[in-house]
């Protein structure tokens, strides 16, 4: 009964996120990223830390923190060409930590991952960067993995409401790409364009992904417009923005709906104070200057993505187990 209520709440949150994204996708994204994003990073990292980041050994998470530190160094010294390799190594290295207990096997696995990563970084740099620097920390994190968490919950409970939640999640996502952009009410000001500038490449690359599937209208848009026109004013650019805004908004709301997971009442006063102070400063910086807010929260944003990798892997393993269990019955 409690699980059904949670699923129902999440269905309502999906529909609400979609409804707002249809009309004001740019404003919605910028708002939730600045206001809900920092609180999400802080509370999720706090929750993951209490569960040892779902790793098998007590100090395994130092591996992830080491690569978070390297990513910070690449950002400070303008060495972002190494970012995809570092994220790739952290992603598959986290998987190796879950699978191997032996220190020797872990070391050999890490060497193998680094070698493969360096080869991909050298010979397939464009696509390698696209996947591991752009899509994995953004749309894969907020949409694909959120969808997998919903699927795992539905498989575990086998409830009709759980199945309904995954159907609604997919339906909302598809609907946002199909509903006419003529009803868009976003006010595209110079300030909005400037605030969104750092995210613009995500929209462009996602449009290119859809172009790969040979949508004639998208091909025409890409060929005949500049980047700002494509992202902020074209029909499919607006539809892609709706999808991104929905994915991020629901990702955050889904997390905050899990009050039994966050357990505010069990969090120490000092931790709560630290969380709210950092959150308040972050929102204030975003309000003052959006780009300053992004720079301030870069480390926290990328850290929460990387620290969730073991949980992402564990969820995929659990989904496989659930499917295998149910098909064998």
Each language-model region and where it sits:
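Membrane-interface helix-boundary motifs at transmembrane edges
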Residues: 2, 47-58, 99-109, 151-164, ...
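N-terminal signal-anchor module of multipass membrane proteins
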Residues: 1-52, 288
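Transmembrane helix interruption/hinge and helix-loop junction motifs
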Residues: 21-29, 76-83, 122-130, 285-294
